[in-house]
Amino acid sequence: MYQQNSETGSLGRVVKGSWSDEEDDLLRKCIQKYGEGNWKRVPERAGLNRCRKSCRWRWLNYLKPSIKRGHFNEDEVKFIIQQHKLLGNRWSLIAAKLPGRTINDVKNYCNTHLYKKHSIENIPAPATNTMTHNTSSCVDRPESSATIKEPKWWENILVELQREEKEGKSQNCSGLDFEQDNLGQQDPNINDGMDQWLNSLKEVPNLSYQWEENLLDFDVVNLWA
């Protein structure tokens, strides 16, 4: 069993979706008889299973005889832009100040024309300009980094390291020169020692032939023993 709906004031559930021609005729007859306003009682009076909001929206945007169709003229466009800056997206207030224009028409025009025009006018710069700017900024970076001043204590350490490096190089060079000079000179004591060693070899007595022969015989006897 259906219960009475608080929105429509009639039995049954609320119908949603597109309106039929029969429903449009019922709504027209109701408005012609009772006039606009008091939308809470319109569904009951018209015999519609529609909510009051749906009835009001259908009448103001589609069925009202004074609705003006077609493109907006230049004055209307200027007025919409001016009011939109003041009121924002309050479409019902803007449409109320434009005779014959509906809330949907004003809203759709702003969403399709004004926003599209605004996006076209705010196109970002071409990629080539951005690349050129980035390239120039990259070139300038080494110059800016070169101007960075180091702390005083760090400068002192660098100076000390450079000084020690120079002193080390000078000492290495002097040592190399000394070794090269020594390589070009011969120590006379070396020659004297060599001569003494050779003379000592000459003084060693030679083994007699007889002793060598006896030594060989001794080895043979021991080998076959």
From Swiss-Prot:
SMART domains noted in UniProt: SANT (SM00717)
Keyword set, alphabetical order: Activator, DNA-binding, Nucleus, Repeat, Transcription, Transcription regulation
Role summary: Activates DODA1 and CYP76AD1 in the betalain red pigment pathway.
Domain HTH myb-type: 11-67, 68-118
Keyword Aminoacyl-tRNA synthetase on entry: no
Residue ranges flagged as DNA-binding region: 39-63, 91-114
Miscellaneous: Betalain and anthocyanin MYBs are not interchangeable and BvMYB1 cannot regulate the anthocyanin pathway in Arabidopsis.
Signal peptide: none
Gene3D superfamilies xref list: Homeodomain-like
One Gene Ontology molecular-function label: DNA binding
Species name: Beta vulgaris
GO CC field: nucleus
Annotated compartments: Nucleus
Chief place where the protein resides: nucleus
Record-given protein name: Transcription factor MYB1
Pfam families, per the entry: Myb_DNA-binding
